[in-house]
Amino acid sequence: MNRVLYPGTFDPITKGHGDLVERASRLFDHVIIAVAASPKKNPLFPLEQRVELAREVTKHLPNVEVVGFSTLLAHFAKEQNANVFLRGLRAVSDFEYEFQLANMNRQLAPDVESLFLTPSERYSFISSTLVREIAALGGDITKFVHPAVADALTLRFKK
């Protein structure tokens, strides 16, 4: 069975992330969205809420599971019996960092392959950072995120 691990901070999960998950769900037997705690990134949403939002966005996909983690990714992949890391590449600028990450992961988890997918062109410009900035300034984010995520962002920035 092919089990793919799609790691990220997902702060918040966007339609670009959702596009990759949908496509991965057709390619793999089981997709695990691995939501990283990432405390050094000082996320807008706590881990539990990011996990819940990812579950809401992907609830229509029966072979997709969402799990939070705060350990080394290579160790988490072994715990989950994953044999593939899935990473998204929006632009050439993403490649250098992702290439380094893939090589490091190969050293730490040699049995887990790294696979890169590019998002659909209509989502290639979306990033969680941009979505947060637009939401913080009161802009319309409904084209970039699932309605539950838009609601969570609106509520978060009303405070």
Curated annotation (Swiss-Prot):
Q: Which UniProt keywords apply?
A: ATP-binding, Coenzyme A biosynthesis, Cytoplasm, Magnesium, Nucleotide-binding, Nucleotidyltransferase, Transferase
- Compartments, record wording: Cytoplasm
Catalytic reaction annotation: (R)-4'-phosphopantetheine + ATP + H(+) = 3'-dephospho-CoA + diphosphate
Query: Does the record's keyword annotation contain Transit peptide?
Result: no
Entry keyword Nucleotide-binding: yes
**Pfam families linked:** CTP_transf_like (PF01467)
Q: Which InterPro entries match?
A: Cyt_trans-like (IPR004821), PPAT (IPR001980), Rossmann-like_a/b/a_fold (IPR014729)
List positions binding ATP. Answer: 9-10, 17, 88-90, 98, 123-129
EC number(s) given by UniProt: 2.7.7.3
Q: Where is this site: Transition state stabilizer?
A: 17
Q: What quaternary structure, including any partners, is listed in this protein's UniProt entry? A: Homohexamer.
Functional summary from the UniProt entry: Reversibly transfers an adenylyl group from ATP to 4'-phosphopantetheine, yielding dephospho-CoA (dPCoA) and pyrophosphate.
Protein family (similarity comment)? Belongs to the bacterial CoaD family.
Q: State the name under which the record lists this protein.
A: Phosphopantetheine adenylyltransferase
- This protein's species is Pseudomonas fluorescens (strain SBW25)
